[in-house]
Regions:
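Basic, amphipathic "hinge/linker" alpha-helix immediately C-terminal to the N-terminal HTH DNA-binding motif
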Residues: 1-12
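Secondary-structure junction motif
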Residues: 128-150, 211-219, 229
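Beta-alpha-beta core module
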Residues: 90-97, 101-103, 163-210
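Flexible hinge/capping segments at coil-to-helix
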Residues: 24-25, 93-104, 108-130, 213-216
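Central regulatory/effector-binding core of bacterial HTH transcription factors
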Residues: 26-90, 150, 158-161
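A late-sequence structural motif
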Residues: 43, 191-230
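A short, exposed helix-loop element centered on a Lys and neighboring polar residues
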Residues: 13-21
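Short, well-ordered beta-strand segments
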Residues: 30-34, 82, 107, 131, ...
Length: 230
């Protein structure tokens, strides 16, 4: 733990040195974005690319992790901006909500009997071995979707990273409820839920904290671009 904290302090010191090195007419330094596995990151990547056209000396670093890890890193200053999937507590943060929604569904093996269905309903999953996300707020959202079938949920594993989740499905552990990622093994398939369940994403940064000129300028760029497409 002490080694981890020491490394965090070193990373923060490096970011401060980069931030102080910028000139008045040229933004410099590194903007660190924390993100889980989400298709929404591709949209943020386009914002980063358009920002760099005007500010070519700014670099971006993407730090992958689950929501709790990203929030911790925002708190300790090693991540500037986070992409968090809802539902999530954002009371400590300034934020902008992205318009793009991601659909929930079930990842299963292609030899599963349910693979022949176009959509998956709560009754289809009653009594089936299921793989859930670890985050309690997300699990509550899924359990609400089950409605009257909630008592028949059979959770056999929990996982947060899509690659590891797919490995569990491929190995025959169970069916995984997750967001569509378009990244599957050839012998797996994704079936959307019915009724439909969608998840939004927010871009967050710490309230009442001074950020570097580069981060501040990028936040303004994000807001301006989102206003143009609203």
């Amino acid at each position: 733990l002490l080694k981890q904290r020491a490394q965090e302090i070193i990373n923060i010191e490096e970011k401060i040195r980069e931030d102080l090195s910028h000139s008045d007419d040229m933004l410099m330094g590194t903007i660190t974005i924390g993100s889980g596995e989400t298709c929404v990151l591709s949209g943020v990547a386009k914002l980063a690319a358009s920002f760099r056209k005007e500010n070519p000396k700014v670099m971006f670093e993407v730090c992958s992790g689950i929501a709790d890890d990203i929030k911790d890193k925002i708190e300790n200053g090693t991540v500037d901006i986070g992409l968090l999937k809802e539902p999530v507590d954002i009371s400590k943060y300034e934020f902008v909500r992205l318009g793009q929604k991601e659909k929930w569904g079930v990842i299963m093996r292609k030899d599963c009997p349910l693979a022949e269905k176009e959509y998956i309903t709560p009754k289809d999953l009653a009594g089936q071995p299921l793989i859930f996300a670890k985050r309690e707020s997300v699990r509550n959202e899924i359990e609400n979707w089950f409605g009257d079938c909630c008592d028949n949920i059979k959770i056999v594993a929990s996982c947060d990273l899509i690659y590891n989740t797919e490995s569990l499905v491929k190995g025959g552990v169970g069916l995984a409820l997750c967001i569509d990622s378009d990244m599957y093994y050839d012998d797996l398939c994704f079936k959307p839920l019915s009724p439909m369940l969608e998840t939004g994403t927010v871009i967050v940064w710490r309230k009442n904290r001074t950020v570097s000129p580069s981060v501040n300028s990028f936040i303004k760029h994000i807001k301006k671009c989102l206003e143009c497409i609203a």
